Amino acid sequence: MLLEAVMIVVLMNIAETNLQLPLLLFLFGTIVLCISAVSLGHRLFAFHRWLFGVSSFFYLLASIAIFLLNIGLVYDIFGAIILFHAVNVARGVYGRYRAHYLRNKISTTWWKLNFLIVTVYYLTEAKVINSQSVIIALSVVSFFLLLITIRNLIKYRVQLSNNMDVDWPTLSILVPARNEDHALNEMLINLTSIEYPKLEIIVLDDCSHDKTPEIINSYAHKGVRFVRGKTPAEGWTGKNQALQCLLDEASGEYVLFCDVDVRIGKDSLSPLVTHMMKGKLSMLSVVPARRTFDFMASVFASIQELFMISLPLSTFGQPPASGPCMLFKTEDLVQIGGFSMVSDMVGPEFFFSRTFNRRHKVSMILSSRELGITTRKKLSSIFDTRIRVLYPALQRDPATLLIAVTVLAVTYIGSLTAAISGSFFGAVAVVFLISSNLLVTSVLNPSAWLVSVFNLPIMVLTEMWLAIYSMISYEFGTVRWKKRNICYISLETIPRLPKIKD
């Protein structure tokens, strides 16, 4: 961190006079943060929250000083970056860091933020680039995103077949349910109508407060097994514990985990199992299509599907995965530890897809009319899901979130602003981006294809807001999922360790 302090001193020497005070405050904050990092493993660690508070206070003053200068948009961005750094350091005051990676988080977050700070500053002072070159770059990036979208739509739109000459393996459908009496009856009617020769259906009641247990029991005569869940143990989220309990109860060679709002076609399982066996896969996730048209849900639809298909995630070792519908080979899932490996993780599907990707045994497919796997979510449910998963997906790191929000704003909102201003390349970028959204929507939500022509800016702005709100909720509040808090303070401070007796 001494190098980090030196970097600020260099900036102070070349900065304008009116920026000297904010940078000096920033330097003081960094020095205090250095002391806090050094205190790890030392008796000073007992005062780490006080040190974090002082450091965050200096960063806050630095950002306010820059805002008060009012000398340009780029400098305001500079101040916003420092403000985000203040928020990140303030996590230490609330004990929101995990003890075993506290030092690493301080260091990596600092470098991410200061990369942005130095980039913004030098681009401003040296005038390395101009707006026209940025717009041209955006049009090129948008073109490549369109190409990736087309490639992935072809890759994940698999023509499935259920022609097999071997005996069908046993399959267990596993459904965790918590306070789902409004939708569970419809789902169980759907599951009990599925045609598959060796099928087991197990539904777990995850400590519901409504009529969920009674509804599950009412289908016992149709072969639905009822499992009563338990209060989450320490270190487990409720859903992950429920999924592990279902896995322990299952007897099938393959297990299919489904959310309650997913509907499976009458003949959908045979093609999925065939695809798993022919590809010798350990994991196959399915992105369900939308069942019905809901105007508001379509306008503010989750941008998650667009990102999964338009971004080259597999190139960076993280193949896309869909959590609502996941099919596993039971033996392989148990071999890696099942859900005990992700006991406190939000979005375990990403861990599993990354793990099985190392063995080239993972795949994802997009549902089609022929496959018939669908879902329907209310707008409020979509928002709740995004708040729950966005910040954990960004490593619960404000710096990573800031970078993601900045990239979204520059790519999508920047392109639209340039197009409205009359830029040809800005218009080209907008056409490419809308085309990507239109293609994805036409596959997963065909009835809303017309909405996808104009809803992209709304989706992006909504996603940016939800990402920031997710961060605020996780770091300084609570995140409730089905009336259960899933956000826990993760660092406990023990000022003085007890002596070990011989």
Predicted regions and their residues:
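A conserved acidic beta->alpha catalytic loop
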Residues: 205-214, 230-231, 262
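Catalytic donor/gating beta->alpha subdomain of glycosyltransferases that bind UDP-sugars
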Residues: 276-279, 283-307, 331-334, 339-401, ...
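Membrane-embedded multi-pass helical conduit in multi-pass membrane proteins
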Residues: 13-23, 38-49, 62-75, 91-98, ...
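Short beta-strand-to-loop acidic/aromatic patch adjacent to the donor-nucleotide binding site
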Residues: 252-263
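Short, acidic, metal-binding catalytic loop of nucleotide-sugar glycosyltransferases
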Residues: 189-198
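Long helical/loop segments within the catalytic core of UDP-sugar-dependent glycosyltransferases
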Residues: 227-248, 272-340, 383, 390, ...
